[in-house]
Amino acid sequence: ALGNESLKEYEANRAYPSRVITPKGEETAYGYDTVGRRLSISNTYGTVELAYNSRNFVTSRIDGEGYTTRRFYDRMGNLTTYYPPVQWEKKESGYEYRHDFLERVVDTISPLQEHHRVFRNFDGDITSRIHPVSYALKGEEGEGTRYEYDSDGNCIRILYPDGGVERRF
């Protein structure tokens, strides 16, 4: 825009840039492995390092300040656990993700053991979201936001836990 162009440099036989220089002179360098996965991103703020598993999913990210984020996956490639830097450093629990038989996330458990539970119909539409506090008290029967759909799959009504109703047309 307005004549400003970024300069991109490529290595031989690489589809991705190895270096980008912005119009303001800010430089970012990228490192790749032999199969083309990005392993590092470097600029004046530091270097971010990435690690992958055998299925090419990012499993580790170390930022410019040395903090590590970890991700774990099941055999189907679904994210099962995410550890932000604080939880990983202190060896505390991270975020857990539970999936249904169609590999959709149906429950997210935070490090504080809060459940963000979602129920879906056969079409994949969300029919209810259980509030974390209500889930702790009543489990699957807890209060939350409910959704109703017409025969075409359009959300026509949202029922809130306080009794409020939102209609959609």
Q: Model regions: which residues?
A:
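Beta-strand elements of repeat-based all-beta scaffolds
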Residues: 1-169
